[in-house]
């Protein structure tokens, strides 16, 4: 069993994510338009929401955890912290080295996705911080296992995946996305080097065997467009 996964993202008209690179809007202010995206995200009312590691560390926890003993537990099991919020914040940390200054992001309790080889000292640190965790295979990158555990152990029925492009691309490749909630910012990036909405860094075609069905189109304030698509897995 997996949660319903909605990829909720805002991009420029050329599909780029770096807001600092976007042109200024013709109507309104950039922060106001980004606020529309945030408001739509709250409407989705998912049980949990998720960032990729780079996005989280850049905005919240830039420091790295260091330990001289990298010995893992022989049989690691998921851990649910004693006190958790109604909504959860999920973070994929295949390096098992984020130094957390808080057990929450925007008031939502953190659940870390880790490799089974995570150092025992790091797991002990997370428990002392009141941070829940689960495992995604030996390398920490098996999203299918992670999502199954998130649903079956943590009771998450819906997840809002909010970038960045690398984690979106990984979920796309795994075939785990059920719906795309795409908010189009009325501006352009134009740079070939900017991260795209889906920025898969592996080999092959991550979207192979998948099709999109348009569910709805809404024109929001100041030229913002909200598109919703359903993913279909082609047999």
Placement of each model-derived feature along the sequence:
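Enzymes that bind and transform nitrogen-containing heteroaromatic metabolites
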Residues: 1-235
